[in-house]
Amino acid sequence: MAFTLEEIVQRFGGEIVGDRAHRVGNLAPLDQAGPDQLAFLANPKYLAQVETTRAGAVLINAADLAKLASPDGRNFIVTPNPYAYFARLAQAFIDMATPKAKRGVHPSATVDSSAQIAATAVIGPNVTVEAGVAIGENVRLDANVFVGRGTTIGAGSHLYPNVAVYHGCRLGERAIVHAGAVIGSDGFGFAPDFVGDGDARTGSWVKIPQVGGVSIGPDVEIGANTTIDRGAMADTVIEECVKIDNLVQIGHNCKIGAYTVIAGCAGIAGSTTIGRHCMIGGAVGIAGHVTLGDYVIVTAKSGVSKSLPKAGIYTSAFPAVDHADWNRSAALMRNLDKLRDRIKALEAAVASASGDKA
């Protein structure tokens, strides 16, 4: 299905420069787009590609359009944020191209008679819905999804195959949960009950029942194989519009503030609070019982062991270097205490010599 630039602007806004009747049917990168495709410029370092692209039209901001040597004869949609415009337009194209699932409950699904399921919901093959569950309008549960007792899933949410949502959890409207994610599994809570020391130590770990739940706000997206533990007594809370990548672990009683994004393989220990509009890089590790303020950015592979209350960018990871350089640096680090002692001795000797001269 193709649309004129005029039709696109009527729905998404922006200003057309060029042929308002030109039709485009999908999106493509600047260096690959053809006359029936729409491209976008989000980074001015690719401005040269706009000069040579074959795209039928380009999403661009006014400042970058003004830098073009020869914009005449081509089509543009001018918008302050071409990247966000592209994202919304791409979603619209996908929605139109995706076949609509058949509403209702698949014959192979197991649904408790007390569950409340909206007539517009889609319950796929082998889905299990336990007692007291409430599923809103236009919710889609793909194959093998499990929804535990007393859980609520808000309207417009989509749970992909093999998602498990344990009992007593709440998912807000338009939640997207990708395949294999687990929401509401037990938090990692064990009380030590040991007597003695060393080889004479006896006893065991006593499991602490996790009686809280998980509360997820609207417009949250959770990546594949991510796990969000239920709270020990109160809920683990994920606020509105949080975006969580694949393979992220969020411990019990954490609170993740609205509009925060968390990249893949990050691990957040229990009872940690992360503020609003934060950015957590890939493979970041955050210790338990710490607080990150609003607008905190933690770069990839950093370890956070204490609270970071002030907005800013924080880094503790060591970037990759040549292997031989790393070995030399590691050798120096192992000997820093000896070097410190030598420097102190030299400073003392200099001070003593200066005193003798005086």
Curated annotation (Swiss-Prot):
Top-level EC class as recorded in UniProt: transferase
Cited InterPro entries: Hexapep, Hexapep_transf_CS, LpxD, Trimer_LpxA-like_sf, UDP_GlcNAc_AcTrfase_non-rep
Catalytic residues as annotated in Swiss-Prot or TrEMBL: H252
Family the UniProt entry places it in: Belongs to the transferase hexapeptide repeat family. LpxD subfamily.
PANTHER family recorded: UDP-3-O-ACYLGLUCOSAMINE N-ACYLTRANSFERASE (PTHR43378), UDP-3-O-ACYLGLUCOSAMINE N-ACYLTRANSFERASE 1, MITOCHONDRIAL-RELATED (PTHR43378:SF2)
Entry function: Catalyzes the N-acylation of UDP-3-O-acylglucosamine using 3-hydroxyacyl-ACP as the acyl donor. Is involved in the biosynthesis of lipid A, a phosphorylated glycolipid that anchors the lipopolysaccharide to the outer membrane of the cell.
Protein's UniProt name: UDP-3-O-acylglucosamine N-acyltransferase
Organism per entry: Paraburkholderia phymatum (strain DSM 17167 / CIP 108236 / LMG 21445 / STM815) (Burkholderia phymatum)
Gene: lpxD
